[in-house]
Amino acid sequence: MKNFAIIDSENKEIITAIQKHFGGNIPVLSVGDSFEGYDLLVLTGYESSFQPVENVEIINLHPTLLPSFQGADVLKQAFLSGVKVSGITVHKVEKNNFYGKILAQYPVLIGAATNFSDYVEEIEIVGKKLYPMVIDSIINDRVFDFHDLFNCGCSKNGCSGNCGNCS
């Protein structure tokens, strides 16, 4: 199993979701901390300003479907663009390409009656469910399978959020 840490950000809800999934024992580090001894760093809200670390895999959660809508205010960009499907992307952060290989994506529909706050809330819900499960697959050296989203399998009494135990 890979040793990983979360890089702190203002996105406390996703940090809490990751901690909950893994039983609350995952280190939360600051950008200036030493990353020695970690195989994986999990970003929780950084844009392309985060610099890759030698010999450490880095992943990020992006609140739209890449490769569309990169940079600042991507949620607003996606919502105002008129797209009917947006979503969440989990991607690798690579040395010369912050938006590296896409590891997983999950759609969020934007209907005619969807307002911006509902859209943002749905993006956050999907991110809190998808990201911990992708992290779990990476640290256990398995390929992420979307069926995992619908089956129990996390560390809290064997459930991934589909029952009353994880509410």
Task: Label each PLM-derived region with a short phrase.
Residues M1-S167:
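One-carbon transfer enzymes
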